[in-house]
Amino acid sequence: MRVDLNCDLGEAFGNYSFGGDHQIIPLITSANVACGFHAGDENVMNETVKLAKAHNVAVGAHPGLPDLKGFGRRNIDISNDEIYNLMIYQLGALQGFCRIHQVKINHVKPHGALYQMGAKDREIANVIAQAVYDFDPSLVLVGLANSYLISEAKNVGLITASEVFADRRYEDDGQLVSRKESDAVITDTDEALKQVLKMVKENKVISKNNKEVTLQADTICVHGDGEHALLFVSKIREILMKEGIDIQSL
């Protein structure tokens, strides 16, 4: 049994520091690097790629909507052509830094509202998947388990990784509880660990309404901007190893 452990990193920009990347990155196997639209900038991207390489962590693109103020978590009325182009633009930006540091982009995981839009809307999911395929058909597309991001990525011929969340609660249909709700994020470490083990070992999660939902767990996400992110990552890694589960990149 194996699973990937990923975290969204490189989300500082300019004079604004964000997250504990240097502490978290030695504990994970895949880094989703912000590409400048919702967070990150050219200097942060460069340093994050260098940091990932130094710790033998797989580098992935984390493209988002052009919304620094809202951290890419607000829906934007945007055309399919614009979604396609912003995907290509951000992938190209990260590829430049990967090239000079002689590492390869391994995967792509949309960020925030773009991720949720693709998870719930088949047409948007197809546009995202097609952009990734056109850029590099060997890339892995990471998306919410059981969502349109996964099914549409498979339809266009991409390798997929079904993602589950250690620190998020689920709806009965397998979607994530909206961050607008007060109980959307799990802050209790024991609750998060219990959820992780059930998802990885049983391919199931208990929804907020106490319904058992089936899902595939190829990769576990812990958010680097969370108050308890470092503690979560440390404890999750510890319990996975204790259970004999291999932690490997995608």
UniProtKB/Swiss-Prot annotation:
Which Gene Ontology terms cover its molecular function? Answer: 5-oxoprolinase (ATP-hydrolyzing) activity; ATP binding
Q: Name one GO biological process term.
A: carbohydrate metabolic process
Q: Identify the enzyme class.
A: hydrolase
Q: Which SUPFAM superfamilies match?
A: Glycoside hydrolase/deacetylase
Disulfide bond residue pairs? none
Q: Which Pfam families match?
A: LamB_YcsF
EC code: 3.5.2.9
In terms of superkingdom, the source organism counts as Bacteria
Catalysed reaction equations from the record? 5-oxo-L-proline + ATP + 2 H2O = L-glutamate + ADP + phosphate + H(+)
The UniProt keyword set, sorted, is: ATP-binding, Hydrolase, Nucleotide-binding
This molecule's function is given as: Catalyzes the cleavage of 5-oxoproline to form L-glutamate coupled to the hydrolysis of ATP to ADP and inorganic phosphate.
- Give the similarity note: Belongs to the LamB/PxpA family.
Quaternary structure (record): Forms a complex composed of PxpA, PxpB and PxpC.
User: Per its record, how is this protein called by name?
Assistant: 5-oxoprolinase subunit A
